[in-house]
Amino acid sequence: MEKLLIEGGRALNGTIRVSGAKNSAVALIPTTILADTPVTIGGVPNISDVKMLGDLLEEIGGKVTYGQEEEMVVDPSNMVAMPLPNGKVKKLRASYYLMGAMLGRFKKAVIGLPGGCHLGPRPIDQHIKGFEALGAHVTNEQGAIYLRADELRGARIYLDVVSVGATINIMLAAVRAKGRTVIENAAKEPEIIDVATLLTSMGARIKGAGTDVIRIDGVDSLHGCHHTIIPDRIEAGTYMILGAASGGEVTVDNVIPQHLESVTAKLREAGVQVETNDDQITVNGNRKLKVVDIKTLVYPGFPTDLQQPFTTLLTKAHGTGVVTDTIYGARFKHIDELRRMNAQIKVEGRSAIVTGPVLLQGAKVKASDLRAGAALVIAGLMADGITEVTGLEHIDRGYENIVDKLKGLGANIWREQMTKQEIEEMKNA
């Protein structure tokens, strides 16, 4: 196991390139199951979640190859509806997309209940409601979801809560169903449009992706195609916040600026200079920071995935700011770690109250989930002294080559192997 060491206090300057979107990739890869011929996906990020999904597709008979320029080619022609009740499937939150894709192609699936980041209750009841409306019989047996259907028929499905995962999963199950499916109160995230674009290129008939009503007319079969993933707006937002935190000038390259309007607006409100053009955003962090309040909302609101990194930034602002997470109320595990670094933060219900400015101090901290990891890396870069971050496996799930990318901006950051004693101490902590 490795740990990350960061020497803080340096202003970061330069250009950092964003990879393909993790939250798209983990849905696009299972989508390939629905095709009869090979699918090529370009811009695939080199992260552990992607590798694990590729391995899962091979477990069910797919052939997965990695080509030039971050390309992944999936040949789904020999796939079978093999049950996946245990193993890798349980380590990966996004493995639930295998349910919709396998149900759509094979009319049956057995998928172990997924893991990923532990952010409190993240139920899949809306997914199941959608599958049942399409005609599937769904049971939960010994920690695995069993899905079976004689046939899938289009239905009108109203989501009780706006859910990206449920919206995508129902789309996957519905594209080869008989008749029309209408998803109402659908999520509008860019990643949903990305999945719909791939499905349409494969021959699906989908209208309304990116709005709150999606209409799908089922087709008998889908074919292979070539698709390029959208840039990762969460990775881009992380580096925008990092630029503001470090006091230098950082240009974030390969972005779609309209996907980041909520983040841009909040940074500007905090007094950060932000300039956007077609596919780049430049953040200048050398001004005094004003305090702002953040409230996470579904897209196009402020993303829950950037709440933790922004909380770190607020330790540098003058005054008291409130960060409220309306999406995942349990997403505050990074706060205790930031407190170890001298941050003045208290948690009340779904809100973190941040008082600044304080100079963060280097410390030994542990990432408990992916975006907490990003928050702690930013904290380490802001802090006085050396910060040691463990729990790197969480960061590697969602950030491609983060060490090399940050070194390119002038950060002093490196990985080291942990000793046996350190690993034991971490497990017992």
Swiss-Prot record:
Catalytic-site annotation from UniProt: 117
GO MF: UDP-N-acetylglucosamine 1-carboxyvinyltransferase activity
Annotated residues for binding of UDP-N-acetyl-alpha-D-glucosamine: 93, 122-126, 305, 327
Uppermost EC category: transferase
Modified sites of kind 2-(S-cysteinyl)pyruvic acid O-phosphothioketal: 117
Keyword terms, alphabetized: Cell cycle, Cell division, Cell shape, Cell wall biogenesis/degradation, Cytoplasm, Peptidoglycan synthesis, Pyruvate, Transferase
First-listed, main subcellular location of the protein, grouped into a coarse class: cytoplasm
Entry's Gene Ontology BP terms: cell division; cell wall organization; peptidoglycan biosynthetic process; regulation of cell shape; UDP-N-acetylgalactosamine biosynthetic process
Catalyzed chemical reaction(s): phosphoenolpyruvate + UDP-N-acetyl-alpha-D-glucosamine = UDP-N-acetyl-3-O-(1-carboxyvinyl)-alpha-D-glucosamine + phosphate
Domain of life: Bacteria
A single GO cellular-component term on record: cytoplasm
InterPro entries: Enolpyruvate_Tfrase_dom, Enolpyruvate_Tfrase_sf, MurA_subfamily, RNA3'P_cycl/enolpyr_Trfase_a/b, UDP_GlcNAc_COvinyl_MurA
Location of the protein in the cell: Cytoplasm
Pfam families the UniProt entry points to: EPSP_synthase
Residues binding phosphoenolpyruvate: 22-23
Pathway of action: Cell wall biogenesis; peptidoglycan biosynthesis
EC numbers for this chain: 2.5.1.7
Keyword match Cell cycle: yes
Function in brief: Cell wall formation. Adds enolpyruvyl to UDP-N-acetylglucosamine.
Family per record: Belongs to the EPSP synthase family. MurA subfamily.
NCBIfam families in the record: murA, PRK09369.1, PRK12830.1
Protein name: UDP-N-acetylglucosamine 1-carboxyvinyltransferase 2
Source organism of this protein record: Bacillus cereus (strain ATCC 14579 / DSM 31 / CCUG 7414 / JCM 2152 / NBRC 15305 / NCIMB 9373 / NCTC 2599 / NRRL B-3711)
